[in-house]
Amino acid sequence: MSIEVNNESGVTVDEAQLVALARFVFERLYIHPQAELSILLVDEPAMEKLHLELMDEPGATDVLSVPMDELTPGTPDKPTPQGMLGDIAVCPQVAEVQARNAGHSTQDEMLLLTTHGILHLLGYDHADPEEKEEMFGLQRELLEGFTGKEAPSETMQ
């Protein structure tokens, strides 16, 4: 599998842990081992620009997902086909503020946002209460499986 992290944020982040998390999520959700994922870490001005271009919303946000091949989770008998899952942009500066407000570490927030972004790439959403319950439940399950501890509280709506 090809999971690349490009850190343009100017903030030191444990990139190896983000890659390990993505691999864990890929394995748990039966994503093809050759699927590709790009994780871009950007500063607030760059995230604000992306947020405006992609969502037509002002201001920096925590995470943005740009799916490519519209892949969905697989099963043990039928993994997801090979393809480009997509790109995730994460802003460590926004993550730091959200982590502080939620009472957990910035790295835990980065793991939360990366998991959240991957789930969006796989078609999960949280626009209505049922979708939110499914997505956030899976997000917690994946994070707890990866870290071996209780998942950080969600900071996104």
Curated annotation (Swiss-Prot):
PROSITE patterns associated with the record: UPF0054
GO terms of biological process kind: rRNA processing
Alphabetical UniProt keywords: Cytoplasm, Endonuclease, Hydrolase, Metal-binding, Nuclease, Ribosome biogenesis, rRNA processing, Zinc
Compartments it resides in: Cytoplasm
Keyword rRNA processing: yes
Protein's UniProt keywords contain Transferase: no
GO molecular-function terms, A-Z: metalloendopeptidase activity; RNA endonuclease activity; zinc ion binding
Entry note: cofactor: Binds 1 zinc ion.
Transmembrane stretches, start-end: none
Binding site for Zn(2+): 116, 120, 126
A Pfam family it matches: YbeY
EC number: 3.1.-.-
Required cofactor names: Zn(2+)
Coiled-coil region list: none
Annotated Gene3D superfamilies: Metalloproteases ('zincins'), catalytic domain (3.40.390.30)
Single GO cellular component term: cytoplasm
Domain of life: Bacteria
Role summary: Single strand-specific metallo-endoribonuclease involved in late-stage 70S ribosome quality control and in maturation of the 3' terminus of the 16S rRNA.
Family, as annotated: Belongs to the endoribonuclease YbeY family.
Identification of the protein by name: Endoribonuclease YbeY
Organism (species): Arthrobacter sp. (strain FB24)
Name of the gene this protein is made from: ybeY
